[in-house]
Amino acid sequence: MKLSFTKMHGAGNDFVVLDGYSHTLPPLTDVQVRALADRHFGIGADQLLVVEKPTVDGADFKYRIFNCDGGEVEHCGNGARCFVKFVTDRGLTDKRSVRVQVMKGLITLTMQDNGEVVVDMGAPVFEPAQVPFDASGLDGRTDGNDTLWPLDVGGATRWVSTVSMGNPHAVQVVDDAEAYPVLAEGPLIERHARFPKRVNAGFMQIVSRHEVKLRVYERGAGETLACGTGACAAVAAGIRRGLLDTPVTVHTHGGTLTISWDGAHDERAALTMAGPATTVFEGEIELNV
């Protein structure tokens, strides 16, 4: 089976994008997704993005996301920016703002004149059961307007904020994000028994009230150069704890994102993310698995 694809990245978080809107794509198995995402024998990517026609009213497109392990996930902020650049560059829309159907609802994506994309990420969710996070039997610690939860991570206690941005996140504040053992602790948090759907593990260093450094060990993908929903979750947790003020510049290994959230005044407010989206190359691949 021969597939046409576009390789893109958002702040280094890289994607294989498939057009299932202009023509029908065959269903992809998890084995095929892993083959496409393989960096040695395939194209190589953190996630696979599929553009489809919407199945709900009020949406212009449908957006599906598959991690490099083959599993389908709810949301990807960096992918969303690449998504709107893809449909714009392909002439699939002439709108500056589009409404896109994702697993958890609808999101709004806006292409700016400077080439950056603003994503309306919706309101963060902190209720443990909705993340989902099993807080039963745990004594949480109040910090500002947030609750920190103790996790046993390799025999050490780590205090985390739990946040859903349509997908689950556990965020902890660290002194030095660069030196922190993310590759050792990330997998332990990702698969911690308290998170029934696994979790994205974020490690945030506060630089100032408007600036942070962030590393994220993503569920099903490992550490990536950037994670859009992870940046949103980290900033939301920081504002809720009284450590940050909007807007916040988030420095990742792959680039810089700007996150804005008026959560200090209204936690139901939508959070927005602005950042780059880049097309790397296009091609065809013979898929023989």
UniProtKB/Swiss-Prot annotation:
Can you say what this protein is called? Diaminopimelate epimerase
Q: Which domain of life is it from?
A: Bacteria
- What gene is this protein a product of? dapF
One Gene Ontology cellular component annotation?
Answer: cytosol
The compartments listed are: Cytoplasm
The record's top EC class is isomerase
Q: What does this protein do?
A: Catalyzes the stereoinversion of LL-2,6-diaminopimelate (L,L-DAP) to meso-diaminopimelate (meso-DAP), a precursor of L-lysine and an essential component of the bacterial peptidoglycan.
EC number(s)?
5.1.1.7
